[in-house]
Amino acid sequence: MGRRACCAKEGVKRGAWTSKEDDALAAYVKAHGEGKWREVPQKAGLRRCGKSCRLRWLNYLRPNIRRGNISYDEEDLIIRLHRLLGNRWSLIAGRLPGRTDNEIKNYWNSTLGRRAGAGAGAGGSWVVVAPDTGSHATPAATSGACETGQNSAAHRADPDSAGTTTTSAAAVWAPKAVRCTGGLFFFHRDTTPAHAGETATPMAGGGGGGGGEAGSSDDCSSAASVSLRVGSHDEPCFSGDGDGDWMDDVRALASFLESDEDWLRCQTAGQLA
């Protein structure tokens, strides 16, 4: 079951409305009010369809219709309402006083829909601008696209600078790894240098009674202290700079260990005696 036709199609006039027909329709609606559009053609003496009479009155002959071009604020509101309501033109027209759904639909299909489609494809939001800028609505992402285009044009105009920029951006500082092959030994420099003719201070000794034992321990202590003064440095044995021979560091470490063993051996012999 389809919807019943509003009127018979035989003998119905089609095409543009004349001023005489407009006056007859306006006079009838003002006298009888809106509604019952199927009876309007017969009572008004019009050879038109009832639907055609209704649309002619609502879209063109109403006294409260707002004439003129759609303003920029109205364009912005139409775009926002279309995002929420879609193609429900009657609901959109109800929020724009004086505008008809047919006018809004035609304006969207002819002008505004193309701009909104281009803005949605670019991934930006639409902002309605003032008329002195030369455009009614421009996407917010246009500025980013313009900057990208200017940068690419500058690179094409000056290829040498573009190559320099790429090289400087790709240069990364990477420190060279240094391999440490041994332990780090730190020695403290003796702050009291030994003058000529002075004797080394004994590290362990008694009074006047322990002559032989004290003499042997003093000799060992003197040898150890002298070896420490000779081989002492503020820097570690393994500096790792690679400028000198690394065998010198090994020899210095070996001599220190031998002198240390001699000193321990002397201490042990003195305690046992």
Swiss-Prot record:
Molecular function per GO: transcription cis-regulatory region binding
Q: Does the keyword DNA-binding apply?
A: yes
One GO BP:
cell differentiation
The protein's location, in the record's own words, is:
Nucleus
Keywords of the record:
Activator, DNA-binding, Nucleus, Repeat, Transcription, Transcription regulation
Q: What GO CC annotations are associated with the protein?
A: nucleus
The main location class comes to nucleus
Q: Which residues form a coiled coil?
A: none
Sequence segments annotated as region (Disordered): 137-164, 196-220
All copies of the HTH myb-type domain together span 9-65, 66-116
Q: Which positions form S-S bridges? A: none
The entry's DNA-binding region feature spans 37-61, 89-112
The yes or no answer to whether the keyword rRNA-binding is present is no
Q: Cross-referenced Pfam families, in alphabetical order? A: Myb_DNA-binding
| Compositional bias segments (type: Gly residues) | 204-214
- Please, what other remarks does the record include? According to PubMed:2303027, C1-I allele might be alternatively spliced, giving rise to a much smaller protein.
Query: What does the UniProt record say this protein does?
Result: Controls the expression of genes involved in anthocyanin biosynthesis. Regulates the expression of at least 3 structural genes: chalcone synthase, dihydroflavonol reductase and flavonol O(3) glucosyltransferase. C1 acts as a trans-acting factor.
Write down what this protein is called. Anthocyanin regulatory C1 protein
Q: Which organism is it from?
A: Zea mays (Maize)
